[in-house]
Amino acid sequence: MGSKHKKNASKSLRAFSFIILSASIALVYIFNPVKLIFPSSIIRFHHGLPPQSQEIVTEQPKSHSKFQLKHIYHHGSGKNYKIHRRLDITPEYLAKHDAYFQHFNQLQSGTEQVSLDNLDSVVAQYDWPKHHQGKNPWTIELPMKIAKRPAVRLKQRHDHNYIDSYLQYALSVKSNPQHINNVQLEWISEDISVPDVKDRDTVVSLATISSNAYVRFPKDDDEKKNSDWIDVGEPWVPDDRNNNIEFGWGDDGLRGHIFVSEDNKTVVIGVKGTSGAGLPGSGSEETQANDKTNDNLLFSCCCARISYMWTTVCDCYEKTYTCNQDCLEKELVRKDRYYQAVLDLYRNVTEIYPSESHDIWVTGHSLGGALASLLGRTYGLPVVAYEAPGEMLATQRLHLPQPPGLPKHAENIWHFGNTADPIFMGVCNGASSSCNLAGYALETACHTGRQCVYDVVTDKGWHVNLLNHRIHTVIDDIIMTYNDTAPCADQPPCRDCFNWRFTSRDDSLDDEPPLPNPLRPGKPSTTSSSQHHTSTTTTTETSRPQKCLKRTWYGWCVEWGDEEDA
């Protein structure tokens, strides 16, 4: 009897041990399942996000590299939109302007008294973050961590003519899926090099590149004679009437600063943001007029039509809360607008650094960040933008290509911002807002890609203020004060300009695109008469498009003319 009890006890002990062992294995699988199944990679889930926002990230070995400024591009806009030039930052160039750089470092180190009446001193003081105080923005080396992530991009993205033809066709058919599918876009999935946005040094370095685009450039009399700039667009020769035009940092245009890695394999394009009076920390007033025009075109509901007292940037407004969608889309793709300028800038960069053999990233602050996002979506480039206004509306109006069913976390577009910045949060509008008083109609709030937001209102008790939009504030007082980078999540459901009605020519037409078709000749305008059972056909001549050439101070048009007379 005793031995029988011992056997039963032994069986019970073995059964209990088996249960404990099984439970232990189960717990290991529950809390660390992927390491046991996939020892070569780690899949991480971002907890705390809604299911549709959870991102599965496959981490792979990361590399480090240092980046340095190699080129500056300037693309003209407005009446000078055909001008495009490049400045190479060579040792000879740095030696030539050594005195200016030493003076700049003295300003940053605080050894020289800065007068609030001296605009140059104030701009220099605010253009460069304190984190890099004493460092030369033209020779600084910026460390970054490079990661690998999957991406879905157009196979023909290296063919600029193909991209142009697609954008024109997509605009003509309003991105109608039935017709876009006929193009048979070919998407390819591949692992690409991207900036590691979870590494604080990398986020700071990219923000520094965005800040670098604001730094003033040394100019002298030789500079006005185009001694250092290389024409990559339409040549320009000074004459007696135009011998004082300043290029590179002139009154019209878009700037891009090109940083290149040590191994010459990775290129970062830093797009300059808004320069203008009334926006603190946005640089000098060098490109104020065109920056404001493009800001109001990209981020307003209808050409910056806020009230009858505003001068609109285009003639698409029809009546109260009604706007012509076709007109808006044509304005965005005009050759003298910034979207075309940033496309041309990218194409000239790829002449030196071909996209087939180089990894190209884009970054920018404010307007520069939004343009970086539009460029990245057009060509499938990784983008890190800082404090950019909502660019989703512009993306839709431009009908940019997007892989079907691709989740936002796979787009490789990251928007960094803070909750105390009214421009990034989309609340810098209304009659009493600072943006409105400065002449900016920033009415959009929706972003594409992922949003990485520092909640400084909750964490630090900050108040919403336009001063928190400055790039050096973002670097010195936000990113550098947090141990980790901001968590990234999808944009919640968002719609801009919901109270506006947008009209289009295809509202009353069939869905067939009005493209040349040899099998279906165009229909002439006809007038029929029932008398004598005869009909006559007359072709009416379409009138040339006209636009407003001159307005009164309260917005009433007093002079109309042809498009080319503007």
Swiss-Prot record:
Enzyme Commission number, as recorded: 3.1.1.3
Transmembrane segments: 18-38
Topology of this chain in the membrane: Single-pass type II membrane protein
PANTHER family found in the cross-reference section: LIPASE ATG15-RELATED
Free-text function comment from the UniProt entry: Lipase which is essential for lysis of subvacuolar cytoplasm to vacuole targeted bodies and intravacuolar autophagic bodies. Involved in the lysis of intravacuolar multivesicular body (MVB) vesicles. The intravacuolar membrane disintegration by ATG15 is critical to life span extension.
Segments on the Lumenal face: 39-566
Complexes and interactors: Binds to both phosphatidylinositol (PI) and phosphatidylinositol 3,5-bisphosphate (PIP2).
Keywords: Autophagy, Endosome, Glycoprotein, Hydrolase, Lipid degradation, Lipid metabolism, Membrane, Signal-anchor, Transmembrane, Transmembrane helix
UniProt cross-references to Pfam families, sorted A to Z: Lipase_3
GO molecular function, one term: phospholipase activity
Stretch list, region Disordered: 507-545
Primary location class: membrane
Cellular component per GO, a single term: vacuolar lumen
Cross-referenced InterPro entries: AB_hydrolase_fold, ATG15_Lipase, Fungal_lipase-type
Catalytic activity annotation: a triacylglycerol + H2O = a diacylglycerol + a fatty acid + H(+)
Family indicated by similarity: Belongs to the AB hydrolase superfamily. Lipase family.
Record-given protein name: Putative lipase ATG15
UniProt-annotated glycosylation sites, renumbered to this chain: 264, 348, 483
Active site: 366
Comp. bias regions, Low complexity: 522-543
Intracellular or extracellular location(s): Endosome, Multivesicular body membrane; Prevacuolar compartment membrane
BP terms from Gene Ontology: multivesicular body membrane disassembly; neutral lipid catabolic process; phosphatidylserine catabolic process; piecemeal microautophagy of the nucleus
